[in-house]
């Protein structure tokens, strides 16, 4: 120790050393890169299993994609969002003037290979096969969040109200009702069909122009998605875990097989295992390790509003034909938009919010804006619409957990448990084979 200038101290299960000339060394069992809701859930599950874990992110916890989602734990979401094959829908999206989809024309050449593969995987037979595999994750999404939220004292953030699609035309309503019946038969998903009077009873402050709704009753909504992540973080830290700010691209594997990451304060974190939960930024690490995953981002925007007068929104609501979503949050009514196809880091273009706001005001009495500017987030997407979860094919003690697209919040607790079971050598409670990184 004198020769190396290292002073070792014991933390709560981890070794923390101070090298007199070059900062701190922190020895732990696991490093989790990325402190979105997937990363926080993974770190918590590892810490619960006695693996001393450090969570690392360049920003605060859940300050990127996980901050601004629609707040749904989508128990009904067995079919991941596919690329449309209907010619009318494709023509409508090509006009680039809708709320549910928008694209940067300059980005299309770069995105074209991804979009073509996405389109191919969205063909009916293939999409149905994907849904059967995806459902093995989705079926546990509520129960796994319930378990973590109970431990973290965050059950008050979970609302058991489900969510609603509301309709303007009988054609769309009939089609979605028939689809819901098929999903109930195939996957046991529960719903209520609402005619106009039933919808007005459930949501008296929505416009009476709507003809009905589909109420998915199994999902859970979250009144403060960022608050849920912070509760999971607090539980993780109470069990002895640590969160440090640092740059994931400093990840390096030593000759002895251990992994190191350097925090912004100079701390060198070293561990046997590392888990990459970097969402849309995963490629910044994986490409340097020789992996070329076909990732793309779907961007999304949100804005909060005060409800006018005594108006109350009782459920999260999707205006199906218009393509925007209203969710009651602690901060106000959150208006979210559909997907924007652009390159990661391109300047914000919140045109979808601009299109949605006047229509949403006709549906529900929104008051003043509560945010200084629109929020922008990036959803990490794979062309087969399934996340990448599992051990890296060519590196020991490296595990991937990213690519959850629209279902990062939904699948965070499920993914965290799966990864922790993989790392600790337990039997994995969901068959991980369909989600293995090696499929790409």
Residue ranges and their predicted role:
Residues 112-231:
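Rossmann-like flavin
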Residues 321, 365-440:
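C-terminal catalytic lobe of FAD-dependent flavoproteins
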Residues 71-73, 77, 81-120, 250-253, ...:
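Active-site substrate-recognition segment that forms the wall
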Residues 237-248:
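A conserved beta-strand/loop element that lines the FAD pocket in flavoprotein oxidoreductases
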Residues 48-67:
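Glycine-rich FAD pyrophosphate-binding loop
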Residues 29-54:
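N-terminal Rossmann-like FAD-binding beta1-loop-alpha1 element of flavoenzymes
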